[in-house]
Amino acid sequence: GGIGLSFSMLTEKMGAAQVIGIDPVEARREKALEIGATNTIDPSKDDMYEALEDLTGGEGIDIVVDATGDPEGFGQSLKIVKRWGTFVSFSLTGSTGKISEFPHQEFMFKAATIIPTQVAATSQPTKDIREMIALKERGWADPGLLKSHNVGFEDVQTAYDMYANHEDGVIKVVMELNGGGKS
């Protein structure tokens, strides 16, 4: 989704030689390739582990970012991270907050650095917005590239339904409070 795409955009700018986007939604895989990913994998059709083995020569991934919101994402990330790699957990896992598995042997063998994050939480939103604007002005990241739809505020439920059901290639929706508009 939008968080994973943002990481794809930024890591490519930071010089990552290979950026792999994993997403079951075709529109998001296409967007990932447009904004910096070198490869994408559809985990609903492809064996993700086999595809990653081929793409990395069996070495695993240096930096894995889990932004799936899926309880299985944590365990999968530990399985695909390179030995002594880094795993950034940027994912909430539903109302229980529990992960489905913790592959302890992978954890011990990989000796990966695990970095937890605070998802969508900030005490200074205007500061964060200014930083994002500065990144855009320097050509580092353009959050506008993630916008897939504009809707007027009166269509908030339609926008939410599109987002919740992954309809119409939705990635990020901009709500316009002044009766804006349809695209």
Which residues does each predicted region cover?
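Glycine-centered, small-residue-biased loops immediately flanking beta-strands
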Residues: G85-T86, A112
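C-terminal hydrophobic helical "lid"/dimerization subdomain
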Residues: G75-L78, K127-S183
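Acidic carboxylate diad motif detector
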Residues: F90-S91
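N-terminal Rossmann-like NAD(P) cofactor-binding module of classical short-chain dehydrogenase/reductase
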Residues: D62-V65
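C-terminal substrate-binding/catalytic core of Rossmann-like NAD(P)-dependent dehydrogenases/reductases
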Residues: E53, G97-S148, Q157-T158
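Conserved amphipathic alpha-helix within the SDR
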Residues: M48-G58
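Helix-to-beta-strand junctions that scaffold the AdoMet/dcAdoMet cofactor pocket
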Residues: V81-R83
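Mid-domain Rossmann-like dinucleotide-binding core that forms the NAD(H)/NADP(H) cofactor-binding site
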Residues: G1-D46, E50
